[in-house]
Amino acid sequence: MEPDFWHSKWNAEQIGFHLNEVNPLLIKYWPALDLAPNSQVFVPLCGKSLDLCYLAELGHKVVGCELNQTAVEQFFAENSLPHLMTPAKESISELNRFDASDITLYQGDLFSLTPEELSGVDAFYDRAALIAWPESMRLAYVEKLIELLPPKSMGLLVTLDYPQEALKGPPFAVSNDWVMANMADYFELELLSSEDVLNENPRFVNKQVPWLTESVYQLKRRG
């Protein structure tokens, strides 16, 4: 999606994708990665997710990237986190940087993020990034993720799948076949769960979407 689309959603407070709790799937499946507490975790398209705080509470150093500055500012304000903001013009980065004790957020275009800015990353968590891209842009995101993540890094990926013609995304439908066809060359993939969650999502029910499958994958970057 174009940046203006996401900025307009935040400006209008149309953020149905935001959860007001830690994602239960993160709580359930993150321990399977068996990471050291001080591991550094990358969270792309993080919004103001409470998952960032949860990961930090586990002892991880969390690095997120979010396009919209309002989302970043709300995250720190709503969680009462003192932070330091470094504008892009005052650093070598093309993104604004917000630093709290265990959480760093880069604000700006994900595609401007560099591997150097993620040096030290051991893991990643994608709940709402892959499904935020229409199919025409999705592969470019995967290629960027591959560029940013070092070999052997572990990750958790959450996807949604449904008949795309039944509803205009985002979130967009991402099938298991798409994940395997486009990511298996770069990641070892293990499907941890796949469940129908239609009844838990009124928007999809109201649009008469016939089914909605939420899947969780464990990934390991090849190399």
Curated annotation (Swiss-Prot):
| Cell compartments where the protein resides | Cytoplasm
**A Gene Ontology cellular-component term:** cytoplasm
GO BP term, pick one: response to metal ion
Q: Where is S-adenosyl-L-methionine bound in this sequence? A: W10, L45, E66, R127
The gene behind this protein is tpm
Q: Which InterPro entries match?
A: SAM-dependent_MTases_sf (IPR029063), Thiopur_S-MeTfrase_Se/Te_detox (IPR022474), Thiopurine_S-MeTrfase (IPR025835), TPMT (IPR008854)
Which species does the entry assign this protein to? Answer: Shewanella woodyi (strain ATCC 51908 / MS32)
So what does this thing catalyse?
A: S-adenosyl-L-methionine + a thiopurine = S-adenosyl-L-homocysteine + a thiopurine S-methylether
The entry assigns this protein to a family as follows: Belongs to the class I-like SAM-binding methyltransferase superfamily. TPMT family.
Covalent S-S links between cysteines: none
Tell me which SUPFAM superfamilies the record gives.
S-adenosyl-L-methionine-dependent methyltransferases
Which protein, by its recorded name, is this? Thiopurine S-methyltransferase
Question: EC number(s) of the enzyme?
Answer: 2.1.1.67
The principal localisation class reads cytoplasm
Q: Which Pfam families does the entry link to?
A: TPMT
Gene3D superfamilies in the record: Vaccinia Virus protein VP39
- Enumerate the UniProt keywords alphabetically: Cytoplasm, Methyltransferase, S-adenosyl-L-methionine, Transferase
